[in-house]
Amino acid sequence: MTRSAKKGPFCDAHLLKKVEVATSGKDKKPIKTWSRRSTILPEFIGLTIAVHNGRQHVPVYVTENMVGHKLGEFAITRTFKGHAADKKAKR
């Protein structure tokens, strides 16, 4: 179930403060955050946000197409190593 339209998009307050500082100072350094649940807002366009995936911070450059999505969608948490080889096929 999606979030109610009357509530509006959710974004953590500490992340909004960091974005305001970055846009006012024209700072190109990535904004480090653990908030994967925050929605990408139009103010984030053009910024690089380092989103934590449980192990490291993955840099995500925000474009216009990403607005409305969550930050966690762009930082993959699971690594796929491939399926085990079939032992019968090797013989």
From Swiss-Prot:
Annotated GO CC locations: cytoplasm; small ribosomal subunit
Q: Which GO terms describe its biological process?
A: ribosomal small subunit assembly; translation
Does this entry carry the keyword Membrane? no
Q: Which domain of life is it from?
A: Bacteria
Has keyword Ribonucleoprotein?
yes
Could you tell me the keywords of this UniProt record?
Ribonucleoprotein, Ribosomal protein, RNA-binding, rRNA-binding
User: InterPro entries attached here?
Assistant: Ribosomal_uS19, Ribosomal_uS19_bac-type, Ribosomal_uS19_CS, Ribosomal_uS19_SF
State any single GO MF term. Answer: rRNA binding
What Gene3D superfamilies has UniProt attached to this entry?
Answer: 30s Ribosomal Protein S19, Chain A
Recorded hits in SUPFAM superfamilies, A to Z, give:
Ribosomal protein S19 (SSF54570)
Q: Which family does it belong to?
A: Belongs to the universal ribosomal protein uS19 family.
- Cross-referenced HAMAP family: Ribosomal_uS19
State the function annotated in the UniProt record: Protein S19 forms a complex with S13 that binds strongly to the 16S ribosomal RNA.
- What name appears for this protein in its UniProt entry? Small ribosomal subunit protein uS19
Question: Which gene name belongs to this protein?
Answer: rpsS
